[in-house]
Amino acid sequence: DLKNVFPPKVAVFEPSEAEISHTQKATLVCLATGFYPDHVELSWWVNGKEVHSGVSTDPQPLKEQPALNDSRYCLSSRLRVSATFWQNPRNHFRCQVQFYGLSENDEWTQDRAKPVTQIVSAEAWGRADCGFTSESYQQGVLSATILYEILLGKATLYAVLVSALVLMAMVKRKDSRG
């Protein structure tokens, strides 16, 4: 029944600090929920490239309410990486779910968005063990750049001032001799 077609909601859960400190590994969990029918493909992408190593995905989607014939489905997947790889704030992790829904030709009369075939994804950035995120790293670089420009400007101003004083002293000495 076409009115029961729903695309997934996708979320990525970051690794626990306990796992990282005890095993030196980091497991990201992807959860796709609320979709029907169960025609989906889940993939992990790291820094823009699809990865298969360290990936463990449920063999098939599970019914959220097994007693119902037209129950929506859920699917989970895990990506395990080294703690040091996770703790690099430049690393970008994305869980992508390809949902095979309605085609453009299928008639749709419901008062919600038509659940067409689509890609739904969620993402996370590596998180340094000192609390750095990609955003805080970029903010730090920006602050350092501004500070450097201020110090460079002060040094230039100081050099101009000292040069002017030396020039004035030379002119004054020349005037007093001549």
UniProtKB/Swiss-Prot annotation:
SUPFAM superfamilies: Immunoglobulin. Alpha-beta TR is a heterodimer composed of an alpha and beta chain; disulfide-linked. The alpha-beta TR is associated with the transmembrane signaling CD3 coreceptor proteins to form the TR-CD3 (TcR or TCR). The assembly of alpha-beta TR heterodimers with CD3 occurs in the endoplasmic reticulum where a single alpha-beta TR heterodimer associates with one CD3D-CD3E heterodimer, one CD3G-CD3E heterodimer and one CD247 homodimer forming a stable octameric structure. CD3D-CD3E and CD3G-CD3E heterodimers preferentially associate with TR alpha and TR beta chains, respectively. Glycans are attached at residue 69. This is T cell receptor beta constant 2. The connecting peptide (CP) domain is essential for signal transmission in response to antigenic stimulation, likely downstream from ZAP70 recruitment. The TM domain mediates the interaction with the CD3 subunits. It is found in: Cell membrane. The keyword Ribosomal protein does not apply. The chain crosses the membrane at residues 145-167. Residues 168-178 are cytoplasmic. The gene is TRBC2. InterPro entries: Ig-like_dom, Ig-like_dom_sf, Ig-like_fold, Ig_C1-set, Immune_Resp_Modulators. CDD domains: IgC1_TCR_beta. Keywords: Adaptive immunity, Cell membrane, Disulfide bond, Glycoprotein, Immunity, Immunoglobulin domain, Membrane, Receptor, T cell receptor, Transmembrane, Transmembrane helix. PROSITE patterns: IG_LIKE. One of its GO terms (biological process) is adaptive immune response. Constant region of T cell receptor (TR) beta chain. Alpha-beta T cell receptors are antigen specific receptors which are essential to the immune response and are present on the cell surface of T lymphocytes. Recognize peptide-major histocompatibility (MH) (pMH) complexes that are displayed by antigen presenting cells (APC), a prerequisite for efficient T cell adaptive immunity against pathogens. Residues 8-117 form the Ig-like C1-type domain. Residues 130-144 are annotated as: Connecting peptide. Disulfide bonds join 30-95. One of its GO terms (cellular component) is alpha-beta T cell receptor complex. It comes from Homo sapiens. Its main location: membrane.
